[in-house]
């Protein structure tokens, strides 16, 4: 009966998953909302504030660029009553320690924009998942003026855009080897020492990424509540498969849609500590998936009963009883 129950749960989950996949397909990459009461920068301005015509035009141009050019893995919401506010979510890319995760950013266009870059805050949940993303929410990026770089990497008022900022965070910050984002560490990239340290750092980052998933599911940012729920429902099995593979020794980043990405990379192995840490935290993630409705993950099917073995055991018990009665 338990085995049949699990099959029915899987079938039900499969039909629900199709509906949620449709929701995700139809979720607009760019859209506007009425308010942002939980926005990090909401207290830094007022809805009634009058901005210059040039400022309004520039922000509207930014909206247009985002609406037409956002990649499939970045979603943005603008605020109708507060044109200075945006919220963005970036999906972690395959092959990185951020794979399948959602990473949220609150953005504000200052009064002097675009003479100065936008303000960007990362929803960290108190976790430091990258040298450029502080647990206080600070985002270090040359383009934002929060990190030093050459002139071409800095904010250029007549050229730089909000789209460029978001794509830079995705490509340059949430990358395959975030360890080397730390200043000076790039000098040892490619060496045994550098790659060893990078591996340990990335393994820890993946664990923090799992914790970020839990944080987002428990406290999804406003206007992305349904998106968070549907995203993790749809990706739950891939995330669990990846965790099981990492527990078994697969190297971090080798899993793509539940399969091994690179045979040469797969010959390597995750560290013993990584396997243990993933195993110890995995159940917390699974519990959150179950709360979302992925019920079959809560069921542990028992192996089917072997009738022949059952009959033999029954005969043995009968013989024992007959002997004891003599």
Curated annotation (Swiss-Prot):
PANTHER family with a match to the protein in the record: (E3-INDEPENDENT) E2 UBIQUITIN-CONJUGATING ENZYME, UBIQUITIN-CONJUGATING ENZYME E2 26-RELATED
PROSITE patterns assigned to the protein according to its UniProt record, in alphabetical order: UBC_2
Composition skew (Basic residues), residue ranges: 315-326
GO molecular function, one term: ubiquitin conjugating enzyme activity
Protein family membership: Belongs to the ubiquitin-conjugating enzyme family.
Pathway the protein takes part in: Protein modification; protein ubiquitination
Span list, region Disordered: 297-326
The keyword Nucleotide-binding is annotated on this UniProt entry: yes
CDD domains reported for this sequence: UBCc_UBE2O
Function according to Swiss-Prot or TrEMBL: Accepts the ubiquitin from the E1 complex and catalyzes its covalent attachment to other proteins.
Keywords: ATP-binding, Nucleotide-binding, Transferase, Ubl conjugation pathway
Keyword ATP-binding among UniProt keywords: yes
Gene: UBC38
Protein name listed in UniProt: Putative ubiquitin-conjugating enzyme E2 38
SUPFAM superfamilies linked to this entry: UBC-like
Active site: 140
GO biological process terms, semicolon-separated: protein ubiquitination
Catalytic activity, reaction form: S-ubiquitinyl-[E1 ubiquitin-activating enzyme]-L-cysteine + [E2 ubiquitin-conjugating enzyme]-L-cysteine = [E1 ubiquitin-activating enzyme]-L-cysteine + S-ubiquitinyl-[E2 ubiquitin-conjugating enzyme]-L-cysteine
